[in-house]
């Protein structure tokens, strides 16, 4: 990676974590294979030639903004301002691309966001989508540049700014094109958009529309009947806990058997509220402090390493199970999983070929399977 971004999440990782978490992934090959977002700042002539020769499409590009001076400043890379010219080179090679903006309050929002949206929408049809995600900060951030997270009013302003553009895109070509991260709706206290607004969820792997997708999977799996009768605790990040609780009430309206347990992220800081960044130690602490007596515990599969039952702090899932031998602890990845576990706990078992959505740099999520936040 040629950058030292103001908002780099890799630089905010706590010490003594799994070493692979500190690997920066600004690599167009990973972008093509796994949907990782890249900035294109480390691209040379040979890279563009290879992309053209092999037709590596689509790619996933972290734009952040289209103002050349501001982009170079935010990425701390003097040659980062050429993003529109670089996108043009991809287009000349017949390459399509998805884009994202990591939105930082007071930097690339407001008029700068308006400029970015205008520039990227003008690059259709090569530009396939634009995702806007809020900057994520942890308590381990040491970068001296002041960044703040969006509050309720700030998130509402972003939604209000983007919605007219979404309506314009739908009027022009029947799809939304511009998608906001679920966190904006959570922060603003608003409902996430209906599934139709996500156009098949082209940036689901980036965490865009996970909540609506999860609800849709639940609804598709739901059958008439009540909960299975087992007493279950549902571990989640604080952001999505209300959504999980609302679904649980459909099966257990009296709140007698299903208890959603929002876990504060003590490791990264309370401002980090997604399920996929919960570590094993924080989950264990929450279970020790839990007042309800339960038979089983559902944990987010997204908190486990891709293809391996290990949390971000290198705690194996088996170690968590060993600490609570009286509890059956199972990962849940999708809305269908969640429904199956709550409605038929005795027969629920997920053979996990993959850990669901796994956090990657720049506030993104990576392929290949659906997951739970």
What are these regions (language model features)?
Residues 11, 62, 133, 181, ...:
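Conserved residues at the C-terminal ends of beta-strands
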Residues 58-60, 96-98, 129-131, 177-179, ...:
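Structural preference for beta-strand elements that scaffold enzyme active sites
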Residues 17, 121-123, 136-373:
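Auxiliary Fe-S-binding modules of radical SAM enzymes
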Residues 62, 101, 131, 331-333:
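Short loop/turn and capping residues at structural boundaries
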Residues 1-126, 136-165:
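Conserved Radical SAM active-site core
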Residues 100-102, 130, 299-303:
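Short glycine-rich or small-residue beta-strand-to-loop segments that form or flank ligand, phosphate
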